[in-house]
Regions:
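Cytosolic regulatory/linker segments at or just downstream of nucleotide-handling modules
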Residues: 153-212
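Short, surface-exposed loop/helix-turn segments at secondary-structure junctions
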Residues: 129-141, 175-183
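Short gly/ser/thr-rich secondary-structure transition/capping motifs
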Residues: 1-6, 99-101
Length: 212
């Protein structure tokens, strides 16, 4: 019997204004070195489940989850909002929810771990990538790259966000409501690798930065 493979045409690429969130695990390299690989998998699963729940609780859509981190988009299907408040609240929830997990890992496994989060708001392309049997909807564009770079610069226990996110928050009062009145800092401009010109950065700071 001959089987016919149907190739379904993917939906057209569209553009949207989205707040993109990246989050990843600090301390993963040391964890992978010290523990058997089979022991690392359930720890990563616990970590990613915690992050995903925080993102989805604030309306985020998970677009990529691999290894020690994830990418989520906020307001992807909502033309009436920018997702900045929800993304910032989700980032803070990730830090809060992972804290007891990290404490248990430290107590039981002597592993130091934390979460770093980066946010950027702007235009993205929403489209399907990959061969038919492995297709996935994803976000592409400079906004995604900047969010990823900010995540890589964030310290454990910290959310870094760009000037576009700060502008999208619209007012200090709204920011305070989204962050639970946690102080946020404007950092000196810095260059992001592979991108022209410095950008303005704000953060919900880690204790290590507040102690400086």
């Amino acid at each position: 019997m001959r089987m016919t493979v149907r190739h379904v045409r993917p939906p057209p690429v569209r553009t949207a204004q989205v707040t993109v969130l990246f989050a990843d695990l600090r301390g993963y390299t040391g964890m992978a070195e010290r523990l058997p690989a089979a022991r690392v998998i359930p720890l990563l699963d616990e970590f990613l489940r915690s992050l995903a729940a925080a993102a989805e609780n604030f309306g985020g859509t998970i677009f990529h989850m691999a290894g020690d981190g994830l990418m989520a988009g906020f307001a992807v299907d909502d033309d009436s909002g920018n997702g900045a408040h929800d993304a910032l609240a989700a980032g803070r929830a990730m830090l809060r929810d992972f804290a007891p997990i990290a404490a248990r890992w430290r107590r039981e496994l002597e592993i130091d771990a934390g979460v770093g989060v980066g946010l950027h708001f702007g235009d993205v392309a929403v489209g399907v990538l990959g061969p038919s049997q492995h297709q996935a909807i994803t976000l592409v564009g400079d906004t995604v790259n900047v969010a990823a770079r900010l995540c890589s610069r964030a310290r454990a226990g910290e959310v870094l966000f760009s000037c576009t996110v700060a502008a999208a928050l619209e007012a200090t009062a709204a920011t305070d409501a989204a962050t639970g009145a946690v102080p946020f800092l404007q950092l000196p401009q810095f260059e992001l690798r592979g991108r022209r010109g410095p950008i303005d950065i704000w953060c919900l700071p880690a204790a290590s930065r507040l102690a400086l």
